UniProtKB/Swiss-Prot annotation:
This is Probable kinetochore protein spc24. Its main location: nucleus. It is found in: Nucleus; Chromosome, Centromere, Kinetochore; Cytoplasm, Cytoskeleton, Microtubule organizing center, Spindle pole body. InterPro entries: Ndc80_Spc24, Spc24_Fungi_globular_sf. CDD domains: RWD_Spc24 (cd11565). Residues 42-127 form a coiled coil.
């Protein structure tokens, strides 16, 4: 039996029957896996720390910039600036409107002065007196001609008026006559088909000359 055998012999046989090589290989593989995992973990940890430091620096930079912007541009100053700029904008717009109105007034005055200048140039230095004298002379000479000559002159005047009215209509100007003014032409309707405008002008010979109205009609057309 077992007790009768030599213990050393039993131990030797037991040792020979044990096969621990596969276990040792398994333990080695587990140790290598643990080492690889530890290295990978350390690498990811270092990368995470590096990214965290970068994000921290970016955050500090953005916070500094935000503080600078906030300190240099307060909401009260911004509102005050906007209000001041709005006031300046309205003031400039009003000045522009006033200047446009003044320009229109000066243009009208310039047209009146130009018309007056043309009238004076056409009349000449003694034009008014000469025309008056000529009119008086022709009146004296025509007093003895008789009713036949007067009738021919009336027809000639009517033909001239009709011709003028026809010319005006061809230009887009309608001349109207009012009965309460003694049958004189006192109103002109100027139509500009190109712009689609209609302008009504009250003709007052005592206020403006015919040259002024002629220039005004041309400018309107």
């Amino acid at each position: 039996m077992l007790l009768e055998e030599d213990p050393s012999t039993l131990i030797a046989h037991t040792t020979q029957n044990f096969n621990i090589t596969p276990d040792r290989h398994a333990v080695s593989r587990v140790a290598e896996s643990l080492s690889t995992l530890q290295q990978a973990r350390d690498l990811r940890l270092r990368e995470s720390e590096t990214n965290l430091k970068k994000l921290a620096r970016t955050l500090n930079t953005l916070q500094s910039q935000h503080q600078e912007v906030t300190s240099s541009h307060s909401s009260a100053e911004h509102a005050s600036l906007i209000s001041r700029l709005d006031t300046q904008k309205f003031r400039v717009a009003k000045n522009v409107s006033d200047l446009e109105m003044e320009t229109e007034r000066l243009q009208t005055q310039l047209a009146e002065l130009q018309a007056r200048l043309q009238e004076l140039e056409l009349q000449g230095v003694d034009g008014g007196d000469a025309s008056a004298a000529g009119g008086a002379t022709s009146t004296g000479e025509n007093n003895g001609n008789g009713s036949a000559g007067n009738g021919g002159q009336v027809r000639s005047v009517e033909d001239e008026v009709l011709l003028r009215l026809k010319v005006y209509r061809s230009l887009g100007i309608e001349i109207e006559r009012e009965e309460q003014d003694g049958g004189e032409f006192t109103r002109a309707v100027v139509r500009n088909d190109r712009r689609g405008d209609v302008c009504v002008v009250n003709v007052d010979r005592h206020r403006f000359s015919r040259f002024f109205y002629a220039n005004y009609f041309w400018q309107t057309l």
